[in-house]
């Protein structure tokens, strides 16, 4: 049975892969029994390793700061990508749908603190580059698809 996790899901998790079991994580508490509460900018994804076939993030990645200084310097976006890698099983898929540069939607919301480009996932988290490894990224993804849907960059990565 396929299991999927939707990050920053609000009250209803997305399920684009038609998984049998769907879970969510949101900063707001008590949304539904299948939705865990966590601030993913500073907390781990509250599920075990290798648990999901799919992890999705709709309109979420842009809200996770790249770096925070509380109480010490942390690369919170890189830490989140490590967490996504950790909870995905081998060959699991991560789907990100996020407003991205050069579109105004990437900048206009003051809570958009992580500006994504076509190169962000390709060069920093996918083979053969994995440039984020110098900032602590320990995973390894393969970029399997990337395209634009309006102002949103739609990216699919496979855990290798």
Give the positions of each predicted feature:
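A short beta-strand submotif of the Rossmann-like class I SAM-dependent methyltransferase core
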Residues: 54-60, 66
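Conserved beta-strand signature within the Rossmann-like core of class I S-adenosyl-L-methionine
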Residues: 91-98
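Core SAM-dependent methyltransferase catalytic element
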Residues: 141-160
């Amino acid at each position: 049975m396929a299991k999927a996790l939707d990050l920053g899901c609000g009250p209803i998790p997305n399920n684009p892969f038609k998984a049998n079991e769907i879970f969510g994580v949101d900063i707001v508490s008590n949304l539904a029994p299948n939705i865990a509460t966590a601030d993913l900018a500073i907390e781990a994804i509250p599920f075990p390793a290798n648990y999901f076939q799919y992890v999705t993030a709709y309109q979420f990645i842009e809200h996770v700061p790249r770096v925070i200084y509380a109480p010490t310097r942390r690369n919170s976006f890189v830490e989140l990508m490590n967490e996504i890698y950790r909870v995905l099983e081998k060959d699991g898929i991560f789907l990100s749908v996020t407003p991205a540069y050069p579109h105004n939607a990437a900048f206009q919301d003051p809570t958009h603190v992580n500006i994504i480009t076509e190169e962000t996932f390709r060069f920093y988290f996918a083979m053969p580059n994995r440039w984020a490894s110098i900032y602590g990224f320990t995973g390894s993804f393969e970029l399997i698809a990337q395209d634009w849907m309006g102002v949103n960059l739609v990216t699919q990565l496979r855990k290798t």
